[in-house]
């Protein structure tokens, strides 16, 4: 009887539903750095694995005032390259229309790197830390940049659940470079929602109730709130009106820090 119980318990663990993961994030930084990540999913190249592409493998391009650095492997796949550039243009164009001109100019200083398929990256992330990049075998030139690590995954996610993913990543850059990750107002609001518990179980875009990705840390909280305020997020609150009713304090902070109270 005891053996049957143990086997049943093991089977229940084996077939447990995986924890929902968000594909885009700020990468984990070494101790003492300001960036964090919910679940480290990337490692530096190990024995027998290809290293990250060298700087010479990237060609410079431009899109609506943003510098693009495109991996030559992606350029070689002409159709995929075109699709990715079209989607990047589409998202950046929306950003130029919905944000104040001053903020757009600040975001245009953030380069965007495009990969065909980097096995050590998820689809899209912002890199705040040169030391983390160096320690994990990445190009340190990617520091303070947005990195699209997988072209196909980027296209898939933007079509199915995250139409404003570049806004999310550029919000990380703005938070890091212009507000500071320890911005007092954002930290206060983040601590308040953790205590209130009203982000612990929210509607996800697939109809499931899940823990909101914003609870990861104050960085994701700000980026997720920015997505909801200016576009559409994949976690409730999905849009601006819902953010205003669900989290009025953060609604006002987003308005203020993006310059909409002037």
Regions found by a protein language model. Name each.
Residues 71, 81-195, 238, 251:
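Acidic/His-rich structured neighborhood in mature extracellular/periplasmic domains
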Residues 8-18:
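Bacterial N-terminal signal peptides
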Residues 57, 160-164, 212:
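Alpha-helical hydrophobic/aromatic positions enriched in membrane-embedded helices and signal peptides
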Residues 5, 20-115, 119, 128, ...:
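N-terminal low-structure segments adjacent to metalloprotease catalytic domains
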Residues 1-7:
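Bacterial N-terminal signal peptides that target proteins for export
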Residues 134-143, 149-152, 156, 190-262:
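Metalloprotease/metallohydrolase-associated module, dominated by Zn2+-dependent proteases
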């Amino acid at each position: 009887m005891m053996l049957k119980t143990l086997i049943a318990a093991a089977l229940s663990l084996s077939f447990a539903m995986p924890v929902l993961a968000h594909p885009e994030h700020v990468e984990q930084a070494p101790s003492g750095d300001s960036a964090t990540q919910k679940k480290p999913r990337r490692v530096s190249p190990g024995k027998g694995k290809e290293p990250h592409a060298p700087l010479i493998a990237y060609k410079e391009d431009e899109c609506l005032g943003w510098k693009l650095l495109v991996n030559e492997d992606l350029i070689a796949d002409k159709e995929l390259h075109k699709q990715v550039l079209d989607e990047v243009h589409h998202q950046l164009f929306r950003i130029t229309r919905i944000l104040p001109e001053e903020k757009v100019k600040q975001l245009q200083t953030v380069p965007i790197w495009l990969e065909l398929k980097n096995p050590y990256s998820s689809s899209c992330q912002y890199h705040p830390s040169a030391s983390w990049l160096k320690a994990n075998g990445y190009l340190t030139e990617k520091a303070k940049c947005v990195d699209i690590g997988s072209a196909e995954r980027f296209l898939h996610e933007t079509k199915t659940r995250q139409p404003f993913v570049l806004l999310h990543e550029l919000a990380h850059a703005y938070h890091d470079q212009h507000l500071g990750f320890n911005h007092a107002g954002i930290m206060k609001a983040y601590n308040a929602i953790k205590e209130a518990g009203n982000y612990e179980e929210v509607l996800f875009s697939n109809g499931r109730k899940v823990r909101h990705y914003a609870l990861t840390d104050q960085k994701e909280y700000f980026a997720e709130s920015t997505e909801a305020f200016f576009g559409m997020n994949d976690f409730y609150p999905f849009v601006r009106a819902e953010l205003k009713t669900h989290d009025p304090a953060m609604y006002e902070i987003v308005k203020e820090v993006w310059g909409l109270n002037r």
